[in-house]
Amino acid sequence: DEPKPDQFVGLM
């Protein structure tokens, strides 16, 4: 599963 943009924002 490739990380979705939403998940990327959650990391920040």
Swiss-Prot record:
Residues found modified as Methionine amide: 12
TM stretches of this protein: none
Keywords of the record: Amidation, Amphibian defense peptide, Neuropeptide, Secreted
Similarity comment: family membership: Belongs to the tachykinin family.
Name listed for the protein in its UniProt record: Hylambates kassinin
Pfam families: Tachykinin
Entry keyword annotation includes Secreted: yes
Keyword Cell wall biogenesis/degradation included in the entry's annotation: no
